[in-house]
Curated annotation (Swiss-Prot):
The gene is gltX. Its cofactor is Zn(2+). Keywords: Aminoacyl-tRNA synthetase, ATP-binding, Cytoplasm, Ligase, Metal-binding, Nucleotide-binding, Protein biosynthesis, Zinc. This is Glutamate--tRNA ligase. Its EC number is 6.1.1.17. The lineage of its organism: Bacteria, Pseudomonadati, Pseudomonadota, Gammaproteobacteria, Enterobacterales. InterPro entries: aa-tRNA-synth_I_cd-bd, aa-tRNA-synth_I_codon-bd_sub2, aa-tRNA-synth_I_CS, aa_tRNA-synth_I_cd-bd_sf, Glu-tRNA-ligase_bac/mito, Glu/Gln-tRNA-synth, Glu/Gln-tRNA-synth_Ib_cat-dom, GluQ/Sye. ATP binds at K240. PANTHER family: GLUTAMATE--TRNA LIGASE (PTHR43311), GLUTAMATE--TRNA LIGASE, MITOCHONDRIAL-RELATED (PTHR43311:SF2). Disulfide bonds: none annotated. Monomer. One of its GO terms (molecular function) is glutamate-tRNA ligase activity. Its main location: cytoplasm.
Length: 471
């Protein structure tokens, strides 16, 4: 049997992390078994579905590099197919027209609730032989079996059983002629030959209804696997108040797709004690049997740790391709300064996100107008004038500009003045970066460049001179 899975989001908003994890599990299962992965856009909610949401979903999938083999399919382009199947069901007697008014249905609901019963349609039109005009408004309902039960072997949770007496005669076509979500899903899974439906646990109650429709159509029934929800670290359902929940928001916040994928795959699935997984390892090791039945707690600190790991272990040239977007958001002109791959090497240890990296690298490319006030007050004092003058002259004398020779110049200055490295290094750091913190000083000065470093030292000396004149 050829394995075929699908990811079927509704385009009513962005791609959130719960949906992304479902997509990842479906994608991994298909890839593990050498099968196919289908992208389907379930846009039957015409009022809430938007082109912007569709674009956001596609952007999220592409950024995560979860490539699909078929699609994207759009349900709104398949209405003729759905309605043709409904018409066949009406002919076969597995569906029927319902003319009950909203008022009657509301009254029925109130009466059932008053008796402590579960609200459900009472089947009045199912057994009615009353004549109606062809143009009289009606819905079409599925004639759900009235006895027995539906049992399916959930690939994560084990056997689940529903009594047919608990299930309603589901509306499959509205009065305006449009098919409903639960019906469209069934026909799509049938037509697209989906073998495994991997989705959120909020769909468990839909499953027996969909299985009954498939059986009425003499269609094969796929295997089902329902993934538990993701909670915030406070145990409540993950929401905006827990921070970013949109996949692309994590991109905007400076996370690498590898970090988010690695984090999401472990959010409910495990393989021993292993924490770090390459994409290839995920594909090789993934199984639905190792997915937890329990809800998972989203831990941003863990994601941040993974992101820092990947910034420092992936090829700098690759990380730089993602950093470029953040550099552009900061409007930094990188033509006069180190290559971005070099910047990744310089700042990788200090920065946990690419956004942080982009926001802390401007001094490598552009001159600053002011020194950080606290750093200048502490380190650009009259006592720093001589160390800065000496180190400037030694840097000027370097003919082979390298980090190693920069280091020798700083060390030689400290030796000549018989002071500790900090007495030279800290004023120099503030002079060339404008702040009190940076990567190792030798590689920083080297990356900034000889001419620019000397110009900035002279600027710092001018700052010190002005400070002396005011005392």
């Amino acid at each position: 049997m050829k394995i075929k899975t699908r990811f079927a989001p509704s385009p009513t908003g962005y791609l959130h992390v719960g949906g992304a994890r479902t997509a990842l599990y479906s994608w991994l299962f298909a890839r593990h078994h050498g099968g196919e992965f289908v992208l389907r856009i379930e846009d039957t909610d015409l009022e809430r579905s938007t082109p912007e949401a569709i674009e956001a979903i596609m952007d999220g999938m592409n950024w995560l590099n979860l490539e699909w083999d078929e699609g994207p399919y759009f349900q709104t382009k398949r209405f003729d197919r759905y309605n043709a199947v409904i018409d066949e069901m009406l002919e076969a007697g597995t569906a029927y027209k319902c003319y009950c008014s909203k008022e009657r249905l509301e009254q029925l609901r109130e009466e059932q609730m008053a008796k402590g019963e579960k609200p459900r349609y009472d089947g009045r039109c199912r057994h009615s032989y009353e004549h109606h005009a062809d143009d009289e408004p009606c819905v079409v309902r599925f004639a759900n079996p009235q006895d027995g039960s539906v049992i399916f072997d959930d690939q994560i949770r084990g056997p689940i059983e529903f009594s047919n007496q608990e299930l309603d005669d589901l509306i499959i076509r509205r009065t305006d002629g449009s098919p409903t979500y639960n019906f469209c899903v069934v026909v799509d899974d049938w037509d697209m030959e989906i073998t495994h439906v991997i989705r959120g646990e909020d769909h468990i109650n839909n499953t027996p209804r969909q299985i009954n429709i498939l059986k009425a159509l003499n269609a094969p029934v796929p295997m089902y696997a329902h993934v538990s929800m993701i909670n915030g670290d406070d145990g409540k359902k993950l929401s905006k108040r827990h921070g970013a929940v949109s996949v692309m928001q994590y991109r905007d916040d400076g996370y690498l797709p590898e970090a988010l994928l690695n984090y999401l795959v472990r959010l409910g699935w495990s393989s021993g004690d292993q924490e770090i997984f390459t994409r290839e390892e995920m594909i090789k090791l993934f199984s639905l049997g190792a997915v937890s039945k329990s809800a998972s707690a989203f831990n941003t600190d863990k994601l941040l740790w993974l992101n820092h790991h990947y910034i420092n272990t992936l090829a700098p040239e690759y990380v730089a391709t993602h950093l470029q977007w953040h550099i552009e958001q900061e409007n930094i002109d990188t033509r006069n300064g180190p290559q971005l791959a070099e910047l990744v090497k310089l700042l990788g240890e200090r920065c946990k996100t690419l956004k942080e990296m982009a926001q802390s690298c401007r001094y490598f490319y552009e001159d600053f107008s002011e020194f950080d006030a606290d750093a200048a007050k502490k380190h650009l004092r009259p006592v720093a004038r001589q160390p800065l003058e000496v180190v400037r002259d030694k840097l000027s004398a370097i003919t082979d500009w390298s980090a190693e020779n920069v280091h020798h110049a700083i060390q030689a200055t400290a030796d000549e003045l018989e002071v500790g490295m900090g007495k030279v290094g800290m004023p120099l750091r503030v002079a060339v970066t404008g702040a009190g913190q940076s990567p190792a000083l030798d590689v920083t000065v080297h990356a900034i460049g000889k001419t620019r470093s000397i110009e900035r030292i002279n600027k710092a000396l001018g700052f010190i001179a002005e400070r002396e004149s005011q005392q």
